Amino acid sequence: MPGPCNCIETNVCICGTGCSGKCCRCGDACKCASGCGCSGCKVVCKCSGTCACGCDCTGPTNCKCESGCSCK
């Protein structure tokens, strides 16, 4: 049985302490912020330098980095 934070499997998002609903971080139905403490709320999206992944990034297939940055 997957954990409550494994949103990709359960499609139910329970964000950890300090998480906001600003950006989607763990699947289309989930709105955990990048600092979410839940293990299932992490996505692999590598942007160049110190640039962060954009709000539309839900995984490697649709990685969107901040303006002026490139995705690896």
Curated annotation (Swiss-Prot):
Sites where the protein binds Cd(2+) 2: C19, C24, C38, C41
Q: Tell me what turns on expression of this protein.
A: By cadmium.
Top-rank taxon, per record: Eukaryota
Q: Where does Cd(2+) 1 bind?
A: C15, C19, C32, C36
Give me the residues that bind Cd(2+) 4, please: C45, C57, C63, C71
Q: Does the keyword Metal-binding apply?
A: yes
Homology family: Belongs to the metallothionein superfamily. Type 2 family.
- Give the protein's recorded name: Metallothionein 20-II
